[in-house]
A protein has these predicted regions:
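Active-site metal-binding core of divalent-cation-utilizing nuclease and nuclease-like domains
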Residues: 29-31
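Polar/charged, Gly/Pro-rich intrinsically disordered segments
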Residues: 33-34, 40-64, 92-131
Length: 131
């Protein structure tokens, strides 16, 4: 019980840190004129006593911009690179680079140097990227 309580507390502290750092990084992008909405959710994986970070990010730029969809994807990729660098430095997590295959985004996240991926990315719906 104490172990789970400690992990839950650690999860809460880590989530607060992730949220604050994500706020700072997203602010930098918004200062460039991009509209970004996002949510950070951190879950404790009970069986392995590891935590996963789920980021849901929506990037939008002026619809009148030429190739706005491709630009949104690039901004998303840049933003995720910045976030992954922070998480690696702060928590020892490793992110494999995001892979774009047509309209699908794929990201593998590793925690604490593990060779086993514990979160495999997901879905893209228009310019909404979720994982």
């Amino acid at each position: 019980m104490k172990k789970m309580l400690g992990m839950a507390l650690l999860c809460g502290i880590c989530l607060f840190g992730c949220q604050n750092e994500t706020d700072k990084i997203v602010d930098e992008y918004e200062n460039l004129g991009y509209t970004i909405t996002y949510e950070v959710e951190e879950n404790l994986i009970e069986k392995s006593n590891r935590m996963s970070v789920h980021l849901s990010i929506y990037v939008q730029i002026d619809e009148g911009t030429h190739n706005s969809y491709e630009r949104e994807k690039q901004i998303f990729k840049d933003l995720m690179t910045d976030l992954s660098e922070h998480f690696y430095e702060e928590y020892g997590e490793r992110y494999e680079n995001q892979h774009y295959n047509g309209h699908h985004v794929s990201t593998v996240i590793y925690l604490n140097g593990s060779d086993e991926p514990f979160l495999l990315s997901n879905t893209e719906d228009d310019s909404t990227f979720i994982f």
